[in-house]
Amino acid sequence: MAQDRECLCSAGFQRGDYTQGNTDRSTAAANSRPPAGQRGAEEPSSGGAGTPPPAAVLPTMPDEATENAGSTSARVSSFFIEDLLGTEGGGGTRRAAAGGGGGRGAPRCGPHSPLRLGASGCPLRDAAVGWYRRAFLGCASPDTSDRDSPELPEDTERAGGGGRAAARGPAGGRQSSGGREEEEERGEEAGEAEQRAAGRKKKTRTVFSRSQVFQLESTFDVKRYLSSSERAGLAASLHLTETQVKIWFQNRRNKWKRQLAADLEAANLSHAAQRIVRVPILYHENSPASALGFGLPHMSPPLVGFSGGVSYPLGTFPAASLPFLRSQMTGLV
């Protein structure tokens, strides 16, 4: 029993030492920590190289501050002369001199403010206002807008393509008005051409009275072609123009030629039909063969009868048809 009590006492003593050691350590750590205000100031220095400090706490150098201020001021469109001259510096005077020498020698009125600035510091409105001011003061004509207008950087020109068109307002207006006038003139010319073509197509046909047609027909039967004097006299007597009489005679001659061609064609067809028709030959049975006179041409030939009841002598037939007649007669016998 005594041994058990000694073991328990030793165990409790060790446990008490352990808890006391832990409490001593916690108090020492609490005492070693700095106050809240000092802790925020010391944390950036004790952070190490691996962890970057916050951006708001980083100290800024004077050069960086001036650069940031210059960039913000350049981004903001400022219209003060001091800002414009300060941003460009000494290079502005050289550019202004080069730009002035590149013109056509037009006189410059008043002080020339340099407008050729960077893309961020040169607004397009300044260029337009300066150009209009010079144009209205009579320093330069609007026709020389390409050379007298201030040259802008490429970025500004791309960004403000519509502004340049606005800056060329007077010249563009003239060109557009001239183009409209040309289009109107072309439209009028096209309309006149259409009217002329329509007038040519709508030719009215001359209507002749019965008395005029009778007189023209009687004159045509007498003479197919008229001289100029005859045509003039006929036109005066019929109260017509010479052109109308001339055209009527031309049409009448064409009609007459067509009628002649049709008559000739009909005559040729009838003649061909007459050649094709064959007529059978009949002879008398009692008449001897020697009486026909084929071998004696000096004797008067007898009559040969046809089916139509008409008799023709053999002398009327040509000599070439005698073999044909002989073959026909021998075939019938």
From Swiss-Prot:
Key words, A-Z: Developmental protein, DNA-binding, Homeobox, Nucleus, Repressor, Transcription, Transcription regulation
CDD domains reported for this sequence: homeodomain (cd00086)
Keyword Cell wall biogenesis/degradation: no
Keyword check for Transferase: no
SUPFAM superfamilies: Homeodomain-like (SSF46689)
Bias kind Polar residues: ranges: 17-30
Span(s) of short sequence motif HMX family specific domain 1: 261-271
Primary role: DNA-binding protein that binds to the 5'-CAAG-3' core sequence. May function as a transcriptional repressor. Seems to act as a transcriptional antagonist of NKX2-5. May play an important role in the development of craniofacial structures such as the eye and ear.
GO cellular component: nucleus
Gly residues biased stretches: 87-105, 159-176
Pfam family, one: Homeodomain
Protein name per UniProt: Homeobox protein HMX1
Compositionally skewed regions (Acidic residues) per UniProt: 181-192
Localisation: Nucleus
GO MF term (any one): DNA-binding transcription factor activity, RNA polymerase II-specific
Location (main, coarse): nucleus
DNA-binding positions: 201-260
Domain of life: Eukaryota
Annotated GO biological process: negative regulation of DNA-templated transcription; regulation of transcription by RNA polymerase II
Span list, region Disordered: 1-74, 86-109, 139-204
Family: Belongs to the HMX homeobox family.
